[in-house]
Amino acid sequence: MKRLIPGFTLALVAALALVYPRVRAAAPSCEADNGGIKLPEGFCALVAADGLGPARHLVAAPNGDVYVAIQQNRGDVAGIYALRDTNGDGKFDQKELIGNTGGTGIAIRTGYLYLATPTSVLRWKMTPGQLKPAGDAETVVSDLPQRGQHADKGLAFDGKGGLYVNVGAPSNACQQPDRRKGVPGQDPCPLLDTFGGIWKFDENKLGQTFANGTRYATGLRQMPAITWHDGALYIVMNNRDSIDVFWPEHFSAKDNETRPAEPMYRVDKAGDDFGWPYCFYDYTQKKLLLNPEYGGDGKESGRCSQFKEPIAAFPAHWAPVDVTFYTGTQFPKKYQGGAFIAFHGSWNRAPAPQDGYNVTFQPFSGNKPSGAFEVFATGFAGQDPLMQPNQAVARADGVAQAPDGSLYISDSQKGKIWRVVYKGK
């Protein structure tokens, strides 16, 4: 969850104003080159912070302070960076480090700052008027499963006490051994007992373990891009890799450029099943197909009719890592109510160029997509074409709405934070 749940009572809004004293508002000045990124007409960007390290998700407090989850990488600082703009110029000039545990998902809820690490959910009590919490972290959930691959965890809250955490599957398509040419998938896939889904916990109860959670949705490979919006949980999933490498008799390198799609799902009820590892969504045929590990040849649907289809789909291998719905009014009307999605970018489209180093916008009408997506922010890779992912200058990782309706974007390469504003045409 990247913003506060809408629908607060007036009393709670007043309480938050005491916890987060507001700073002087100012129209920020954008960089001449938008900090190296490209935006639609009427938009511009400034670099609000830089050099933070491997920045993941971020969240803005009501007064404009921003909290950024920093991943644990060898030799890097880890924890949460708390950022404050003390003079209203749009750039953060005060920085404090909270904790020393790296994570991905981050949220502010009812006076607490939450962080999802690969194995836990932690929270700190916010101190009125202070940028940095004074006390130590409390453990909300511990013993979350992780086996290295797909360990990053996002957070979402339903506003009724429910805390939702993704548990990614440490696998490509449930083969044993994993990622081997011609090896069939395990059927049923045993990983789905403890991985490959969303688990629900009580946000108000400390000391929970994974065993205390309930599986809310399943059949999802990896999905740190989760958020609660308009009464439902929304997810953008990282789909399987290298379909041509492991099954060349059915799929070519050209097929791998477009298969499978990165799907967006809405969880309508507890127990929804989205079909991984048995099926994938085909971006060109617009339907679920059997994975080759389960007998698929790129045409057969088989058992896939029993699983929920996506509400939207994005090109193969773009790697969605964060999503937030826009509830502000600064941006033009067409953006209001839609979803901004941070894509980390592909690594396995060779021999074709890599792709998907962007922030994309998916328009919505109510709780349904209302048209084709548009690539909103580009230029993160720093070169076009990009052949090797390790040559990318930046990779979008987090998106969060500021109190004034501008949009923050984080970079996991060197820790740059962009603030995107609408100036008008």
Predicted region positions:
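Residue-level detector of Asp-centered blade-edge/turn motifs that repeat once per structural unit
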Residues: A60-G64, I108-T110, F157-K160, T227-G231, ...
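Beta-propeller domain segments
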Residues: A26-L39, D152, A169-A211, T218-Q222, ...
